[in-house]
């Protein structure tokens, strides 16, 4: 279906925030559940999706304390793992909600000097795109470490790409440079 290419897919958006990714997934036909540890984020997401008459199930929870029996075709962990204290535990908790052969996407920040300069010094202190203290460089995750944790939780790496932000046109592009942002695709085995 061209209008709803994600029809019949169940998606879990972990760390959904205000629903910025949950909403377009729902509009593309997916059955979306969005979870976030912040009740304020969940309230904002519900309010916004209700105004658009979208059927998104928002729950205030983290994957570690989520009490549902559902299994999902796709799990989105977008820009969240660099904020958790134990990435391995987080991936373990997340992966238990993934169907066999299901896909998990993880977008995060690499642990490099360049990522420190761009994501913290540049984005927080110089450009003020983010509040100061949003990121802790110690929590950034190298792709090799993420792969190790994923493989230990029955997830096979399918692909890893760099995500490059172009400040001139305000767009993200997929590329080879993983030194700042990257996105990994894993499959449940």
Label the model's feature ranges.
Residues 171-189:
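Core SAM-dependent methyltransferase catalytic element
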Residues 108, 128-145:
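Acceptor-substrate binding/catalytic loop of class I
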Residues 116-125:
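Short, flexible, mixed-charge acidic loops at enzyme active sites
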Residues 2-4, 9-116, 143-146, 184-188:
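Conserved SAM-binding loop
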Residues 111, 165-167:
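Residue-level marker for beta-strand->alpha-helix junctions and adjacent short loops that shape enzyme
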Residues 48-54, 121-122, 172-176:
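Short low-complexity, flexible loop/linker segments enriched in glycine and/or proline
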Residues 138-154, 160:
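Short alpha-helix
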